[in-house]
Regions:
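N-terminal module-boundary/linker segments of secreted carbohydrate-active enzymes
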Residues: 21-88, 285, 292-295, 302-305, ...
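Sec-dependent N-terminal signal peptides
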Residues: 5-14
């Protein structure tokens, strides 16, 4: 073979291999996440961080508009806005000025950019937390932290609220301690229940992707949710309130078909994936009930697995010791009486008895 042709052949093989690694199909997720198996604590956090970066390339802030056409479209073909009931046509009514709901939509930093230096590069254009939302509602949300509202001062058309914070409680073990409760001081913004898990996993995924790149997200109101300390003693980047809130939302609103489709769309545009949409139960190994334990991927199912039921499954299947033993009672066949050649017989299943109850055929 000609040396130049051979070199070109090898180059194409390497390019194809690199492309296959960075654009792993959703059906091959166990292999994609193999590096996190048997990891725990800080090692697990770091491995997930590494996987979350695979294939990433910046869309740029302006590139988000066109990316939304592949990531945030409702079945009716309009923009999927999680803050309002507005249905914006693709490519039209991009903000712009607004005075009321449904005037236009913009690019919402669900992790406000004022929390990390007001940049529109790096995390400032990461589509996993930048979602299309109504301009008016986005403006009302401002840079307030997420939370649950006890008394609303503003409510959007779809029920998203701004107001004073409730106390958030989580029972059981977490990385922040057992049976934790915390409150955010000042106003908080609360999306509707249908999307709380989406935002929680967006926070988990965005934070862990940028954690090793000097992004703390702790400026201003960000300090109520993010600790900036990516060790176990720092709750792996979250405050006690952040752990309580995001765990609660993650558990109460499981991964939906919408999120799965968005995750796949983001890989096609931005190149990377959100580990906590692919394997939702990984959250428990870092911040929740399995904190400190080693991951066993054979106990988990991904959101692409046929056994995973969107909107219901948490991604845990456990092992044989978790399977409840079931005892089956034998089913006794019904006995029938028949008259055969002038003789009364009793037939039960395949057994035949005479009138005196003696087995005459087995």
């Amino acid at each position: 073979m000609n040396r130049r042709i051979f070199s070109s052949f090898i180059f194409l093989l390497l390019v194809g291999w690199a492309f296959a690694v960075s654009v792993t199909p959703a059906g091959n997720l166990p292999e994609y996440y193999a590096a996190v198996n048997n990891q725990s604590g800080k090692n697990l956090f770091d491995k997930v961080h590494t996987v979350a970066k695979v294939g990433y390339h910046s869309l740029g802030y302006d590139g988000l508009w066109s990316a939304y056409k592949q990531t945030d479209v409702r079945p009716d073909g309009t923009i999927w806005d999680m803050y309002s009931n507005c249905h914006f046509k693709l490519g039209s009514k991009q903000c712009g000025n607004y005075g009321s709901e449904c005037d236009c939509y913009n690019r919402e930093h669900s992790i406000p950019k004022s929390w990390f230096g007001k940049t529109t590069s790096g995390p400032g254009c990461d589509i996993f937390h930048l979602v299309p939302t109504d301009g008016k509602v986005n403006g009302m949300r401002s840079n307030y932290a997420f939370g649950e509202v006890s008394s609303a001062s503003y409510t959007s058309g779809n029920g998203s609220k701004l107001g004073s914070s409730k106390t958030i409680s989580v029972n059981g073990k977490t990385v922040a301690g057992d049976n934790i409760s915390a409150t955010c001081s000042g106003k908080v913004f609360e999306p509707i229940d249908e999307y709380k898990g989406d935002f929680a996993r967006g926070y988990f995924g965005t934070m862990i992707r940028w954690a090793g790149d000097h992004q703390a997200f702790t400026s201003g109101n960000g300090g109520s949710i993010f600790s900036g300390n990516y060790t176990a003693t720092g709750n792996f980047g979250l405050t006690k309130y952040g752990v309580a809130l995001l765990l609660k939302w993650h558990r109460e609103d499981p991964v939906s078909e919408k999120e799965i489709a968005r995750n796949n769309g983001i890989q096609k545009t931005q190149g990377n994936r959100n580990p906590f949409i692919d394997y939702p139960y990984l959250v428990e190994y870092i911040w929740g009930e399995k904190a400190g334990e080693k991951v066993n991927l054979s106990n988990l199912i991904s959101s692409s697995d046929s056994r995973f039921h969107p909107g219901e499954s948490n991604g845990w299947i456990g092992d044989a010791t978790d399977v409840e033993e079931v005892t089956f009672e034998p089913i006794v066949p019904t006995a029938v009486k028949v008259l055969r050649d002038g003789q009364l017989l009793i037939i039960q299943g395949e057994k035949v008895y005479n009138a005196q109850g003696c087995l005459i055929n087995n």
